[in-house]
A protein has these predicted regions:
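Conserved glycine-rich cofactor-binding loop
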Residues: 14-15
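Conserved glycine-rich Rossmann-like NAD(P)H-binding loop of the short-chain dehydrogenase/reductase
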Residues: 28-44
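The beta1-alpha1 cofactor-binding region of Rossmann-like NAD(H)/NADP(H)-dependent oxidoreductases
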Residues: 60-71, 98-99
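Substrate-binding pocket helix/loop in short-chain dehydrogenase/reductase
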Residues: 92-93, 100-102
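Active-site helix of classical SDR
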Residues: 116, 152
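Residue(s) in the substrate-gating loop at a strand-loop-helix junction
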Residues: 136
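C-terminal beta-strand-loop-alpha-helix "lid" module of Rossmann-like NAD(P)-dependent dehydrogenases
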Residues: 169-217
Length: 274
């Protein structure tokens, strides 16, 4: 089966890593399908694909909606699934209510696993496939003020590690992508979260985070770097279990492994004024 016959579905594909991935897998000869949540986002994807000179189909897909997931996966029967949909889920544990936490876990844990469950029988029947889960360097460590986001990525890491072994004999590779900071609309969303927490005990710390994001945005990587890796994973005979992407991800990984927990805690408190 050639790449041109293989369908790859990318969720959360209207911007950032998702959009870059949908375009790049199309460029590599796969049938690329972008999952989006609104007609406006579908039009945005169509414009970007046209500008890139590739064909990307869009489907309406809310990964937290079981009916949506079943409909799309039954129709597409994809060779490749890229679970990229996400929400910022920022805020101190004390500030994040049940509904925000639920949305984070449904979007970034339950949704990806639901899609994977639906994809596996089709992939098994086709003789193999690829499930690529977009985690984060913060799926390997934890910092203050984004605990629920990081909890979702830690959960995604654990579930991916279990699933990888469970379905390896079926020729289905489960791959974790662990990026650092790459340009995406999610950073703007995180900034908006700060404005919603004006009365928080942690507002001064949120301001420091917001200022840090603004200062670092020009240093953030181009999402095409991640997209090219994902496209290569789709074509690889034996992809690795996980890939760190970005100089900052590699640096943070070393930092997390070398420094004792107490030292990391102290540095975080000093940096954020906690």
């Amino acid at each position: 089966m050639g790449a041109v016959e293989r369908t790859v579905l990318t969720t959360g594909a209207n911007s950032g890593i998702g959009l870059a991935t949908a375009i790049e897998v199309a460029r590599r000869g796969f049938v690329s399908v972008a999952g989006v949540r609104s007609p406006a986002k579908a039009r945005s994807v169509a414009r970007a694909a046209k500008a890139a000179g590739v064909k990307v189909r869009t489907v309406m897909l809310d990964v937290t909606d079981a009916g949506d997931c079943k409909r799309v996966m039954t129709e597409l029967k994809p060779y490749g699934l890229v679970n990229n949909a996400g929400v910022p889920a920022s805020g101190a544990i004390e500030d994040v209510g049940d509904e925000e936490a639920r949305v984070a876990m449904e979007t970034m844990v339950l949704g990806p696993m639901r899609l994977a469950r639906l994809a596996i029988p089709h992939m098994r029947g086709q003789g193999g496939g690829r499930i690529v889960n977009i985690s984060s360097i913060y799926g390997l460590m934890t910092t203050p003020l984004t605990g629920w986001y990081q909890a979702s990525k830690h959960a995604l890491e654990a579930l991916s590690d279990a699933l990888r072994v469970e379905i390896a004999a079926d020729g289905i590779a489960v791959v974790l992508i662990e990026p650092g900071a790459f340009r995406s609309n999610i950073w703007e969303s995180a900034g908006n979260d700060v404005q919603r927490r004006l009365d928080s005990e942690y507002f001064a710390a949120y301001r420091r985070v917001e200022e840090g994001i603004k200062l670092s945005q020009r240093l953030m990587g181009d999402p095409i770097e991640v997209a090219r890796l994902i496209a290569s994973v789709m074509a690889a005979k034996s992809p690795k279990a996980r890939y760190l992407v970005g100089y900052d991800a590699r640096a943070i990984d070393i930092y997390a492994k070398l420094l004792p927990t107490e030292v990391r805690d102290r540095l975080a408190r000093i940096t954020l004024g906690l």
